[in-house]
Amino acid sequence: MAKVSRQAYAEMFGPTTGDRLRLADTGLMIEVEKDFTVYGEEVKFGGGKVIRDGMGQSQRESKDCADTVITNAVIIDHWGIVKADISIKNGRISNIGKAGNPDIQPGITSVIGPGTEIIAGEGMIVTAGGIDTHIHFICPQQIEEALMSGVTTMIGGGTGPATGTFATTCTPGPWHIQRMLQSIDAYPMNIGLLGKGNASLPGGLREQVDAGAIGLKLHEDWGTTPAAIDCCLGVADDTDTQVAIHTDTLNESGFVETTLAAFKGRTIHTYHTEGAGGGHAPDIIRACGESNVLPSSTNPTRPFTVNTLDEHLDMLMVCHHLDASIAEDIAFAESRIRRETIAAEDILHDLGAFSMLSSDSQAMGRVGEVIIRTWQTADKMKAQRGLLPGDTNRNDNFRVKRYISKYTINPAITHGISHVVGSIEVGKYADLVFWKPAFFGVKPSLILKGGSIAAAAMGDPNASIPTPQPVHYRNMFAGIGQGIRHSSLTFISQSAMNANIRDAYGLEKQVEVVKNCRSITKADMIHNDWQPNITVDPETYQVIANGELLTCEPAKVLPMAQRYFLF
């Protein structure tokens, strides 16, 4: 039997079991765990290649075939790092296995026919679209920026560049919720809105959920008191929606113990749980050890670098409408910026105590850098802390699964949308992101929404081929016209679905209901479920987890940075 070398095979069909890839310019290595394709029966499109009539392409009608097949792709997801053909049917993932022509090929699990489009995955990495759960909808241009970075779902609140939205991720009240839902109909992005959760009586909260909010946001700038927390969580329990919280930095209505007690064991998503983004000073970080708390970070503190502390003060003053001429405002800002807790945050991510990572878009965070900052943190931790248990000198597969879960499956579970998005699994919406390994996490090649190409790095449209410069990100057909309505989702509550707000508001996008938001716990956070006992020294701010001091040095140099960007 004729054989080819591993190098030649990888060059033709992409890496196979046992082959390793470096992620961008990081120190992270992945190793393919399993290859679902069949050696000698690989399908590949092109002149003189396999996917031709009577060869790798069958004669079957479209009802029996995939609409799209991604050939020979390396998948990175929470469940594995594998090589497979990915099939898409009616906008959803229909098969992860071996595509081809079953009339002449063995082991076929998905059929290629005359109605099948092919996307070459050889040498590419495919991941699920990112999910950013901390969005201030300050300007609609954020959506394009996020999409081009590989984010396909945005959850948060706001009404545009209003003072309240600059600081808080809330779309307050039924009128604003309706207007925002009508506006986001025009964008190729899955979106869910959070209403304002700060009230001590339920009526004003319940009406926001009924109007279409998928959850409520408690923010200290609106008054996150124990009474407001208790009321908001009660409404969430009644409506099967999630609550996100930015706690009381000034400790005006109680300390971290007061807030944890107000939760009464009920599930809640704590934003920027380290505290630089806001929350009980100096020890809100303790919350990540609670079984009912689903903790996330925002990206301005990710990872801890020599510049992190300096840039935060000015960001804080702008975002929270503070005045540099008022001493109390300066003191408020400075109380949130602590070297010790930011350093500990790096380690708590690496150990799986912090479960998610998001942006805090235009409100201290950068909407297009969720994915970059995640992998920069992973690289920094490998360099400073070495291998994680489960990893080997050959690969960092477990660490990679831990970190990718922070912006894919775990935010999906937290906000009740994991039945639709958040991973590459059969039956889920085909929101997929393609990366060349050298550009992984930095610059995607293709972004699919609902099985159609919504955005891509595209060359000069007047060129004779697609690749000549200038190459930059452009919306593709699923990102324009009616394609948007059929390739993107608007998430709403069950009560809003019952009220048929889609028709009442004149929405054209498909709508999906959030569910199972209240029964989840920290134990459901995949690869990120550690619940340490944390204490913070009130004078030195040193963080102790299960008796161990958590500290690390700031990074002076990061991967995925200047090497990839001119500006």
From Swiss-Prot:
Catalytic activity line of the entry: urea + 2 H2O + H(+) = hydrogencarbonate + 2 NH4(+)
GO biological process: urea catabolic process
Gene3D superfamilies (alphabetical): Metal-dependent hydrolases, Urease, subunit C, domain 1
Quaternary state and interactors: Heterotrimer of UreA (gamma), UreB (beta) and UreC (alpha) subunits. Three heterotrimers associate to form the active enzyme.
Annotated active site: 320
Molecular-function GO terms, alphabetical: nickel cation binding; urease activity
Keyword Hydrolase: yes
Top-level EC class as recorded in UniProt: hydrolase
The keyword Ribonucleoprotein appears for this protein: no
Chief location category: cytoplasm
Name under which the protein is recorded: Urease subunit alpha
Cofactor(s) demanded: Ni cation
Protein EC: 3.5.1.5
Residues that coordinate or bind Ni(2+) 2: 217, 246, 272
Entry comment on modification after translation: Carboxylation allows a single lysine to coordinate two nickel ions.
Source species of the chain: Polynucleobacter asymbioticus (strain DSM 18221 / CIP 109841 / QLW-P1DMWA-1) (Polynucleobacter necessarius subsp. asymbioticus)
Amino acids binding substrate: 219
Cellular localisation: Cytoplasm
Binding positions for Ni(2+) 1 per the UniProt entry: 134, 136, 217, 360
